[in-house]
């Protein structure tokens, strides 16, 4: 782990940052010799980075692998060994010059195919999206049509036109019942007398009425203090005897006159 971190640090500093600054100086001073040198270095280093991806996967278990890699980077960069220029002149330049035409043809084909593949994938994506939208629309229409067909004419006629049931407040049931009652004497045929009011109401709406009680006059304060004395019932026999007696008394008065 330590060797891997040291190796990455060496490659970053001595393999990238220092050559980048040296290339900047060569471009600024317009020194052709230095310019060619660092161009050869960057070509070799690019090939090294491409090969490093494969070697890190398959050969990283090899002992002293990271140490060898650090030594190789320093050998490429060193002005004494000139490893980058040596590898470029001996191996890279001859192989590239040999296969230059083939590489150019592959690059052109890759550009054309990449453009065509992008267009084909775009068309396929649009076609898939359009087909999915059409299928979803047809499925929804088919489901709606199936539901409508399931209803027969009898089912449609059986649907009542009655309004939806309203909410009944338990605190104001009497007011709601009075609003629901039809007017007095109302029937399907027209208005009738008030005597037939009970017959007009249905069984559910008919409410039994309590017998009306006569209103008693409120007692005055003076009357409430009085004691009502009731006369004892008079018998019939006594009333007749009194009448007879009165008649007997009236007779002698006439004779004297």
UniProtKB/Swiss-Prot annotation:
Family affiliation: Belongs to the DP1 family.
Localization (cell): Endoplasmic reticulum membrane
Residue ranges of the region described as Disordered: 183-257
Function as written in the Swiss-Prot or TrEMBL entry: Microtubule-binding protein required to ensure proper cell division and nuclear envelope reassembly by sequestering the endoplasmic reticulum away from chromosomes during mitosis. Probably acts by clearing the endoplasmic reticulum membrane from metaphase chromosomes.
Organism: Homo sapiens
One Pfam family it belongs to: TB2_DP1_HVA22
GO molecular function terms noted in the UniProt entry: microtubule binding
Protein name per Swiss-Prot or TrEMBL: Receptor expression-enhancing protein 4
Domain of life: Eukaryota
InterPro entries given in the database record: TB2_DP1_HVA22
